[in-house]
Amino acid sequence: MPREDRATWKSNYFLKIIQLLDDYPKCFIVGADNVGSKQMQQIRMSLRGKAVVLMGKNTMMRKAIRGHLENNPALEKLLPHIRGNVGFVFTKEDLTEIRDMLLANKVPAAARAGAIAPCEVTVPAQNTGLGPEKTSFFQALGITTKISRGTIEILSDVQLIKTGDKVGASEATLLNMLNISPFSFGLIIQQVFDNGSIYNPEVLDITEETLHSRFLEGVRNVASVCLQIGYPTVASVPHSIINGYKRVLALSVETDYTFPLAEKVKAFLADPSAFVAAAPVAAATTAAPAAAAAAPAKVEAKEESEESDEDMGFGLFD
């Protein structure tokens, strides 16, 4: 009977993962190291209605996917990434939104001796509140301290652990004494599968503004190269026309050859003061009609005011 139950469970698991792969066009491959059952339950509850979390043995997941390759060959891209303690998060929602929800469900964790540090750990300068008898402990870790009012004070920030280092017993003890929980554990996105394409989760950080700026940077680079080698393209032609016009204008200024636009430049170079004097005159000419138009309006307003006073029976000498 137990064998039948096990076989039935396996069959149901295969059907479930195949159904999820068919129903959901997008999923994350997530690492679940150091994630406990209680935290996993909280993650499932927070994603309810938006995503489905599926964990299982790697061999079973690979077997289920291989058996479904005839119907969906794109799933073969998932196989190389199913290694270690991993699972799937299936969704139809925006991937960035689900990623943010997974990050929000990380929980702080204390450092344990022998664990691999997922991030860098720095102990800030502070008064530890520990007694002088612990001084030798800090000295063994190479941390500069002094005694201040009967307690140990760390004088400067200290990088205690680097990313990927194994946490030593002394480092773990120190962090626990200082009540520092340097790590946070949760489901870590390792790969993104989206409608048959698989890519790094860093792609989710690319915004429309990033794409726009990268595109403009590429256009500028293309225009620069084309200008240097004299090869006309859509990006470089406007600059080529402007540069050509500047050269023709410079040639016209230095020679007797002229054309309408060059005549204005020549006139300016011949007598710049004329253009300086013309600017205030032009401004005054523009302002005069406006003032003239405003004056009749004020007179009309005054006449209307006087007429209204007479109509109301409040003349000046009544």
Curated annotation (Swiss-Prot):
Disulfide bonds: none
Modified positions (Phosphotyrosine) in chain numbering: Y24
Matches recorded under Pfam families: Ribosomal_60s, Ribosomal_L10, RL10P_insert
Modified residues annotated as Phosphoserine in this record: S305, S308
PTM sites of type Phosphothreonine: T59
Acidic residues bias: start-end ranges: 303-312
Principal localisation: nucleus
CDD domains, A to Z: Ribosomal_P0_L10e
GO cellular component: cytoplasm; cytoplasmic ribonucleoprotein granule; cytosolic large ribosomal subunit; endoplasmic reticulum; nucleus; postsynaptic density; ribonucleoprotein complex
InterPro entries: Ribosomal_protein_uL10, Ribosomal_uL10, Ribosomal_uL10-like_insert, Ribosomal_uL10-like_insert_sf, Ribosomal_uL10-like_sf, uL10_eukaryotes
Cross-link annotation Glycyl lysine isopeptide (Lys-Gly) (interchain with G-Cter in SUMO2), location: K298
GO biological process: ribosome biogenesis
Glycyl lysine isopeptide (Lys-Gly) (interchain with G-Cter in SUMO1) crosslink location in chain: K298
Glycyl lysine isopeptide (Lys-Gly) (interchain with G-Cter in ubiquitin), cross-linked positions: K264
Annotated segments matching region Disordered: 298-318
Subcellular localization(s) per the UniProt record: Nucleus; Cytoplasm
Modified how: Ubiquitinated at Lys-264 by RNF14 and RNF25 in response to ribosome collisions (ribosome stalling).
GO MF term list: structural constituent of ribosome
Oligomeric form and interacting partners: P0 forms a pentameric complex by interaction with dimers of P1 and P2. Identified in a IGF2BP1-dependent mRNP granule complex containing untranslated mRNAs. Interacts with APEX1. Interacts with FMR1.
Stated role: Ribosomal protein P0 is the functional equivalent of E.coli protein L10.
Name of the featured protein: Large ribosomal subunit protein uL10
Organism: Sus scrofa (Pig)
